[in-house]
Amino acid sequence: MDYSFDTTAEDPWVRISDCIKNLFSPIMSESHGHMPLQPNASLNEEDGTQGHPDGTPPKLDTANGTPKVYKSADSSTVKKGPPVAPKPAWFRQSLKGLRNRASDPRGLPDPALSTQPAPASREHLGSHIRASSSSSSIRQRISSFETFGSSQLPDKGAQRLSLQPSSGEAAKPLGKHEEGRFSGLLGRGAAPTLVPQQPEQVLSSGSPAASEARDPGVSESPPPGRQPNQKTLPPGPDPLLRLLSTQTEESQGPVLKMPSQRARSFPLTRSQSCETKLLDEKTSKLYSISSQVSSAVMKSLLCLPSSISCAQTPCIPKEGASPTSSSNEDSAANGSAETSALDTGFSLNLSELREYTEGLTEAKEDDDGDHSSLQSGQSVISLLSSEELKKLIEEVKVLDEATLKQLDSIHVTILHKEEGAGLGFSLAGGADLENKVITVHRVFPNGLASQEGTIQKGNEVLSINGKSLKGTTHNDALAILRQAREPRQAVIVTRKLTPEAMPDLNSSTDSAASASAASDVSVESTAEATVCTVTLEKMSAGLGFSLEGGKGSLHGDKPLTINRIFKGAASEQSETVQPGDEILQLAGTAMQGLTRFEAWNIIKALPDGPVTIVIRRKSLQSKETTAAGDS
């Protein structure tokens, strides 16, 4: 399409009007006038060069890198050139900036412009010049930004510093102004460079290279990646480094002292935490000694094998336990669990233990004391370690006479039993009830506590297995009592209350004691249960009942009991088993310590036919007490 037009016959619709020119180029020139259509004159005004009327091809200017197009002057008389959009004012300013940059020795000569061919039109020329000027300025900004970032990233500083001199565009602009700014940034970035080194120094503090990491001047051959870091560090001792070294030394101190502190406070940690809550000094001393003895004896019993613990205890007969002493010696020799269950244990009060400890300190024996009490004191002392015994003696020495008189009423009872067996008594009272003191509500006949004979109804329970009951709620006390079923030994510290305090105790806590003790009867009344053997018919559907409890159940380790009897089953018609019956044996297989899934697999593996089951059923008296407690 030909954009040329004749001046003699000019069509108003073909002619480019002023409004159209202003529409396509809002900023035409500084005077907002028309661009003359003589290309030679326009080039002479903008570029300051002379035209070539001989029609030579366009040449490239090496000073500013802009090609100049020259046309012959003969064609200007007849035809005018095509309309070319004039260049705005900012374009001429960019050309002037390129000229100034070319004359400046610190400028960036762009070798890419000298090798490119000349574009075909002015539009391509302008876009290329704008791209070259913007790219050169972007390179300068990138290079300056990299130098700024290298001072804050010391780990990557060596890589970036080695890459920058390879490019000619980034190496030259670091003149007076840029180098000054870069050195200033490095000076200000000297302090932040210490921050990334903190985890390295903490990790290497235990190694021999820790001193080299703290002092950069000591290391003779540092790694190449850390050389920029050491250059930015100040030569003198930095306060941040000194603070860091002191922090690492302080962090090492408690780590080295932890085992000794643990060893000193381990045996009596639980009792000491309970003693901080006590208000009365005399009572706190009593609780302190009782808790120390209880926790120390319990820990020693758990550390000893069962045969050794059974062999040490029979030398302390106690009233009703004297006929069983010979059988206890035989059980210790034979190692049978059935005969060792007859050994109920022994008890002694703290006054006897105090006399024995005083005898140890004074290197003499008390001949006036009972022989059985001396044997019981010796048996307890033999269970204690030297550190625990020394601390116990120090506790006893500082007691006054009034407190020493109260030691006669405090007894330490050690019971030997089977795993899972109850202690033979129930508890009453608690911090959440009217009676704040935890007492023995009931001693079950034929139980372990009844056979031993020391624990009586109304005695205050100070601790069980080293766990103090001072200030505990009723449910917490019952939980401690249930936890005592698992070990083969139990250490109970009780105190016999004075007769003056007994009426007040009974009058204030009859209702609370009956309700609280009834909730524990279902767990502790093993002596009142009857054991019977029943025979059931095993069908394809099973024995006709479901199980609950077992080891690892939702409520803890419970015995396997009958949960529900199915309708229409033979067990429902015969009424031989009832819900709540504990299953002891099933077809000659003991069910204690099994999970419900294991017991159910045993039932499914049985052949069809009659099956003998040994169950334990609670007596009527126990059920009535439980019902009264529920109501």
UniProtKB/Swiss-Prot annotation:
Residues 128-144 have a biased composition (Low complexity). The keyword Nucleus applies. It holds the Pfam family PDZ. Residues 31-271, 318-340 are annotated as: Disordered. Residues 411-496, 533-618 form the PDZ domain. One of its GO terms (molecular function) is cytokine activity. The keyword Ribosomal protein does not apply. One of its GO terms (biological process) is chemotaxis. Residues 405-501 are annotated as: Interaction with PPP1R12A, PPP1R12B and PPP1R12C. The modification Phosphoserine is found at residue 221. It comes from the Eukaryota. GO terms for cellular component: cytoplasm; extracellular space; nucleus. Residues 195-208, 322-340 have a biased composition (Polar residues). Keywords: Chemotaxis, Cytokine, Cytoplasm, Nucleus, Phosphoprotein, Repeat, Secreted, Transcription, Transcription regulation. PANTHER family: PRO-INTERLEUKIN-16 (PTHR48484:SF2). Homotetramer. Pro-interleukin-16 interacts (via PDZ 2 domain) with PPP1R12A, PPP1R12B and PPP1R12C. Pro-interleukin-16 interacts with GRIN2A. Pro-interleukin-16 interacts with GABPB1. Pro-interleukin-16 interacts (via PDZ 3 domain) with HDAC3. Interleukin-16 stimulates a migratory response in CD4+ lymphocytes, monocytes, and eosinophils. Primes CD4+ T-cells for IL-2 and IL-15 responsiveness. Also induces T-lymphocyte expression of interleukin 2 receptor. Ligand for CD4. Pro-interleukin-16 is involved in cell cycle progression in T-cells. Appears to be involved in transcriptional regulation of SKP2 and is probably part of a transcriptional repression complex on the core promoter of the SKP2 gene. May act as a scaffold for GABPB1 (the DNA-binding subunit the GABP transcription factor complex) and HDAC3 thus maintaining transcriptional repression and blocking cell cycle progression in resting T-cells. This is Pro-interleukin-16.
